[in-house]
């Protein structure tokens, strides 16, 4: 896989397109995102059909509308076995990992670690939390590794 490029998908919540410098913001709020966008691939015409965090993330990961994958509001998890980008990249020989707020496991998972079956194919690296409140403070964040 050494000839294949690295792929990093950064998915921010509730961030307007015009708040990012590479898309025209003069405020210099996102210098690192801007630098990565200039060196990589950025999308100039894109939209989400579900502008709420968990449904939007589920749409991106599955390539489906919320009416197909079932995550039409926060608090609903992806179904175990749903095919995602992680599965596609893994099949192509990539190592796949996830870092950050997950918010796609069912509510009964609670505030602890997300069990492997609810990680939607991210099997090689996991550093995440299913609870928004655990990931909202930049200097006081709780993430769980693969072992919980």
Language-model segment annotations:
Residues 1-148:
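Formylglycine-dependent sulfatase
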């Amino acid at each position: 896989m050494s000839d294949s490029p690295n792929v990093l998908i950064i998915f921010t919540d509730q961030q307007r397109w015009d708040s990012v410098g590479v898309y025209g913001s003069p405020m210099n709020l996102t210098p690192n995102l801007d630098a990565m966008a200039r060196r990589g691939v950025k999308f100039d015409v894109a939209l989400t059909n579900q502008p709420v965090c968990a449904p939007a993330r589920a749409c991106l990961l599955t390539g489906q509308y919320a009416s197909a994958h079932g995550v039409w509001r926060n608090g609903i998890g992806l179904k175990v076995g749903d095919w995602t980008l992680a599965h596609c990249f893994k099949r192509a020989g990539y190592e796949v990992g996830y870092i950050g707020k997950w918010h796609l496991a069912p509510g009964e998972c609670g505030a602890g670690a997300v069990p492997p079956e609810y990680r939607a194919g991210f099997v090689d690296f996991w550093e995440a939390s299913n609870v928004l409140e655990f990931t909202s403070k930049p200097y006081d964040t709780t993430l769980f590794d693969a072992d919980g």
